[in-house]
Amino acid sequence: LDTGCQSEAGIVMDLDSGAVLFAQNIHVQEYPASITKLLTALVVVENTSMDEQVTFSHDAVYNVESGSGNKLQLEEGDVLSVKDCLYVMLLQSSNQAANALAEHVGGSREAFADMMNEKAASLGCRESHFVNPSGLNDPEQLTSAYDMAQIGAAVFGNPTLLEICSTTSATLPPTINNPNGRTYSMEHKLVVTGDSSDENYYPSAVAGKTGYTSLAGQTLVTYAEQDGRRQVAVTLKSTQRTHYSDTKTILDFGFARFKNVSVAENETDYVTGEEPVTIGDETYSPSDLYLDEKAVVTLPNDAQFSDADKY
């Protein structure tokens, strides 16, 4: 089905069932750019505490791609908490904060990249390889829309990271170049736009992360909620700046065309009484079997639960 998505790759995944609702080149390797920082954040929160203090080294601040920016003027010798570094990295896409966090948690950026790859593999990512925590250009830094959806699902399923990624503005504590602190805003336009007349207005958008490099083009990961349903959308290699409009289009497609149906409320084949139950080659006692009350299956709107293939 042609939705008009102009990005090279795009995906919409239902976060409650894991079903892929829209797919366009989802297993093609592309450059991720700064959406890499979602995985960086996930590794950080799983391996350190939020109140630990991070000291910015010379390498963290200055060993970045020329022209990649330093919007908050972070400097060698600055000290921020892990929490503040995460906010700066995820809202302002600070490469310096990504580097500092990687050095703090992994000991070096190279060791941290190994941790990133291990975490990605544990999430089922098979088409990704990470060599730095920021997403700056590197021919070996690759991912796919499918893998980034898996990473996004893990990030937005983490309450700490969901809170950060849905925050529209935050305050930087005093630093060397900002002695009075500084307020800054999130860059993801679908999340921050409150004007219904704006082309980037999308009230279902809750959280997300932007990305751009010369190799990657525009990349975008977006988490959205609507009528009790949760979706993550990824667009990669948008070269015509259609990443926001593409994301709105494919999220709308997922919300409009599909529904979630409770498995526990509809499954009857495995309702047990007192007798043992055989499934395949295995026999179970009734007490061994139960249906997860939260489990859902995502179906097209015109389909019934009985239409679903149980195998």
Residue ranges and their predicted role:
Residues 125-126, 140-142, 146-147, 152-311:
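Domain-terminus/edge residues, biased toward the C-terminal soluble/receptor-binding domains
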Residues 1-146, 150-159, 164:
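Active-site-adjacent loops and short helices of periplasmic peptidoglycan-processing enzymes
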